[in-house]
Amino acid sequence: MQITITREYHLDKLSARFPFLEYLPEELRRHSGRIFNRDERTTEDYQILFIGKSGYGKSSTINALTGHNAMQTSDIEACTKDAFTVEYSLNAQKTRYLSFCDLPGIAESEKTDNEYLALYENMLYHCFCIVYVLRADMRDYTRDLALFREKLSPYRARIVIAINCADKAEPTSRESTDLTGEQIDNLERKRSSVSQIFHMPKEQVIYYSARERINLDALMHQIYNRMTI
């Protein structure tokens, strides 16, 4: 699978948004990243893979976390056919990188899942975190559960289940984008339900909204925790 780098920055850009990330380079020194050939030089990449169905907000989640519209987004069709990344150098020599990687939509059908997963099986093995994106207003997890059982079970310790579109949780309001107490209660129940259904610790299930920039700090913090276990 082709990997296209859409943007490249220094980690300072990201740690300005999430100050706890300034400790990440030191935390990752005890780990070897994925070897990547970049512009006739070899680097170590510490990849965060964003996985989920098309249209559930993988690309917009990366845009929201990084603060850059680096990934093409669409509510009605799949934009990602190959792997696209936003990269952050972890040292002045630019030999180590933190990589936010947007992968093609999966959990669509068994045939397409097998095709895509075969292409990036090596990426799953070497990545440092998998962000599996769901939606707060979805109820059918049949394909997602099948995918977890068949392909993702070995990586559970590195997975964050990210429930996007928290602002769509009932009861919705047109008067404010802030979550109401009732919405938060329903989202907490959603977290508990998803945790039980997928047999994942509740701390690894986070609700947020990429569009409204809700709870992004909690999502990024859990990604950090999964990368540094």
Show the residue positions of the predicted features.
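Canonical P-loop GTPase G-domain recognition
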Residues: 169-229
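Conserved G1/Walker A P-loop phosphate-binding module
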Residues: 2-99
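Conserved nucleotide-binding/hydrolysis micro-motifs of P-loop NTPases
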Residues: 105-107, 137-139, 165-169, 211-214
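Structural beta-sheet core signal
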Residues: 50, 132, 161-163
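Flexible beta-alpha connector loops of hexameric P-loop NTPases
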Residues: 105-113, 176-182
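A short helix->loop->beta-strand "cap" motif at the edges of active sites that frequently abuts
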Residues: 155-159, 203
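Inter-motif core of Ras-like GTPase G domains
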Residues: 112-138, 150-155
